[in-house]
Amino acid sequence: SQAMKTVDAVRHGQCTDVQQAYELDSAQVRSSGRLHGLGAWIADHVDMSGRFHSLPIEYPVLALVPFSLPLVVPPADYTVAFGIEMTLVALGLFALLAWRAGWRAAGFFAVCMSIGAYATGIERFDLVPAGLTLVALLLAERKQWTWAYLALAAGTFLKYYPIVLMLPLFVAHLRSTEAPVRERVRALARPVAVCAAACAGLLLLSLLINPVIFYRQIATLMQRPLEVESVPATLVWLGSHAGFPMRSFGGFGSDNVDSAVAPAAALVVGLIALLALITAISGLWFRRSTLPQAWLAVLMMITIAGKVFSAQYLIWLLPIAALVVPVEGLAPLVWLAACTLTTFSFPFLWRALHGGWHGVIALRNASILVLLANLLPLEEWARWRQAVWAKVVERRRRPAGRAGVQWATQGPSQSTLSELSDT
């Protein structure tokens, strides 16, 4: 719609020339990549040129809500109204943390937001899905499972990343009682069915509004290169100092990098993230980690595993970190360092993108990895290694033990020999 085009025009912080860069026609859909011919079919059979068929180019259907609310003001004041809206969301999260976790947690959130989200906190809408992930966590801790699943479903259709939190929520729900397995599975059925129905309804709504942009969102996730702030891009930058030239270029609304080691870097980071996910979920399953710890670990995993790690992605972590991170020790200092480095790289050093500032991003990403390693129950791997080694040793000893038992049963016993010697 024309109103949403105005929104995109004035939201200069989100992406410049959004409509010019992303407005789609049939030819663009055909050239944007195919999903088994789906793109070509959509381009040939769907006409989305009418009103009320506009979706955010990178975000799911519920993102229309926070972007549409400030439309009550004149277009010239949209940016101010949007900033006020996000400020109210931030204050709401502060109050929620103060109510549920205390003033120290709320203060830690406020300090980290002031430093780490200096340029993105009220210019992006990431506070809204981050708030829903916090609400879902608090509902899960109170065992209000159906509402927790629905909060995550709403967050997922605001910005796709909360979908990964379905796994720790499912595990926590399954381990919430000591009832027999059948009763646990039966208790899961209703909340999961309600969540699946909500997701299916929102997905259908997306397809009805504009299947062309919905297809383009999926194609973008699959095709986009490594964004310069991502963890794989840091490995590419390090590889450039080892003889693998790095190429910088723009596209998909971001600055990107590429080199011969880019696929290997993405694979290595993906494997590290997978190990982190397994460790976090196993720790939650065996009750060696709390649900907030596993929640934060999974969120950190998705940030380091992705092709993009924009400055506003730090907002995803901060409400949950306020619940988990103690106010004493080194952990809060490392969090503050990560926030400072994030703001130092954007916006202050953003114009020096090709001037060598990648080292600041490398330090930020390293601090996030250190925080993730500190959060994970790494002793799980030590226990697993000891258990596997014990089984290996037991199997090696078992044949000799069986032979000795057979000899003892076949031959005369020691008492029998002594009786024979007496006679």
Feature-to-residue mapping (PLM):
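Extracytoplasmic catalytic-loop and juxtamembrane helix elements of membrane-embedded
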Residues: 3-12, 43, 207-239, 243, ...
